[in-house]
């Protein structure tokens, strides 16, 4: 979710930086607005600040625990060493393989392959992740994969948090908002 030290009303420097650098790799970001994420982002930032976690932007060294923003699509480029956006979003499965005219069950199998690759990449960095990716025979609808996709997104963000704590991320943006990415994507 986009967050900033000030209310978000339009595209931020962080969004432009990510889209400029990673758009050619299929990882541009949508422009946030006052409506989306709107008050939710302000409340999230305020709630974390009340707990002692201020938003870390790229204008200063962070020496205390902080809230950071990350973008799973970009993180996956580094995690899986891919050149282009990983096709793992259930709602976009019709677009990913449009030219191939895949059936629903074929799209499910493709998504599950991507899910397994993502989990394998995460397993190299986070121990103890239980098996939660279903077998193709256990999936009857694409929408039933949404909770699995959400769990993967959460784990990807946790991995970026670990990378950030270890000093292996770079914030793209400015003093009001930064999206943190693995430094290997900037300084290979």
What do the PLM-derived regions correspond to, one by one?
Residues 2-188:
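RNase H-like (RuvC/DEDD) metal-dependent nuclease/polynucleotide-processing core
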């Amino acid at each position: 979710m986009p967050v900033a030290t000030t209310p978000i009303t339009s595209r931020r420097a962080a969004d432009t930086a990510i889209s400029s650098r990673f758009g050619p790799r299929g990882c541009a970001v949508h422009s946030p607005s006052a409506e989306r994420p709107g008050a939710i982002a302000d409340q999230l930032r305020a709630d974390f600040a009340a707990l002692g976690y201020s938003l870390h932007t790229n204008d200063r060294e962070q020496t205390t625990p902080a809230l950071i923003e990350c973008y799973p699509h970009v993180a996956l480029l580094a995690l899986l060493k891919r050149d282009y956006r990983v096709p793992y979003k259930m709602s976009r499965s019709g677009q990913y393989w449009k030219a191939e005219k895949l059936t629903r069950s074929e799209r499910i199998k493709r998504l599950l392959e991507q899910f397994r690759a993502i989990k394998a990449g995460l397993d190299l960095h986070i121990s103890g992740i239980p098996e939660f990716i279903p077998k193709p025979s256990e999936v009857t609808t694409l929408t039933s994969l949404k909770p699995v996709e959400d769990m993967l997104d959460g784990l990807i963000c946790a991995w970026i948090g670990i990378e950030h704590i270890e000093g292996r991320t770079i914030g793209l943006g400015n003093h009001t908002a930064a999206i943190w990415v693995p430094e290997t994507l900037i300084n290979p």
